[in-house]
Amino acid sequence: MRNSFITLIFLLLLSGCSEEKEKVVEQESSESITPAQASTSDENNNQTTETTTPAVITPAVQEQIEQKPEVKTFKVTFKIDENDMVLGNKDSKIVVVEYFSPTCPHCAYYHSTIFPELKQKYIDTNKIAYVTREFIATKQDLDASILARCKGDINSFMLFHDIILKQQDKWSVSNKYRELLTDIGQLGGVTPEEYKKCLSDDKITETLIANTNFITKAPKFIGTPSFFVNGVQTENYSINSISAAIDKAIEESKNKIDL
């Protein structure tokens, strides 16, 4: 079944994004993905505008297109669900959802330079619930994301999340990326046997596919990293943009209480 999942992941559709005008998106996400090209972010001059680059569909993947996995439907929204990795206050009325790809250079930049300030200001003070979700565009993204979720707890997830992004330039461009990820796994306490088992865990893969399918329907989503504050997408991933959106949501929440 995993081969079919890999096939479907390479056939993600960004060009067919929803033309709906609502900023808050809620839909049912299925593992059945319409054939098309996937997209990831590309470098730009100001480090705050997302662009996309189509993923390559290899001949080996193309040969598997006819294979169909069992269809299971996940309900994905911009609210917290049982499959989410959450930092901060899970009971907060302010939910920030970050979409990233393990192979995305902008995502690595964000996490090394912007996220620490955001964490100190809003997460450590329990002002928000911060959800990190993956956008899967390549096999490398899939395998790295599975490693990060392998143990299933937020501490392990964030540990691998940090290592994977810091060492992105080493494993993501290597033909031996699986071996390198296996080595990274051992650094974080995941044995090669455990990682192999997680790679065959349909539930993890299904969650990643569902999250990916969901975000492609967001009207303004064009790549990673992308951020949504209570379902409303921020202008970019600068600290000023994200902070402004969070502060606005906090103020609106206070006003509702006052009423």
Curated annotation (Swiss-Prot):
Q: Signal sequence span per UniProt?
A: 1-20
Q: Which UniProt keywords apply?
A: Disulfide bond, Oxidoreductase, Periplasm, Redox-active center, Signal
* GO molecular function, a single term: disulfide oxidoreductase activity
Main location class? periplasm
Give the protein's recorded name.
Putative protein-disulfide oxidoreductase RBE_1288
Provide the Gene Ontology terms for cellular component: periplasmic space
Pfam families per the record? Thioredoxin_4 (PF13462)
Low complexity: bias regions:
43-54
Q: What organism, scientifically named, is this protein from?
A: Rickettsia bellii (strain RML369-C)
PROSITE patterns listed in its UniProt record: THIOREDOXIN_1, THIOREDOXIN_2
Q: Where in the cell is it found?
A: Periplasm
> Where is there biased composition of kind Polar residues?
33-42
Q: What is the purpose of this protein?
A: May be required for disulfide bond formation in some proteins.
Residue span, Thioredoxin domain: 47-251
Q: List the disulfide bonds.
A: C104-C107
Q: What is its EC number?
A: 1.8.-.-
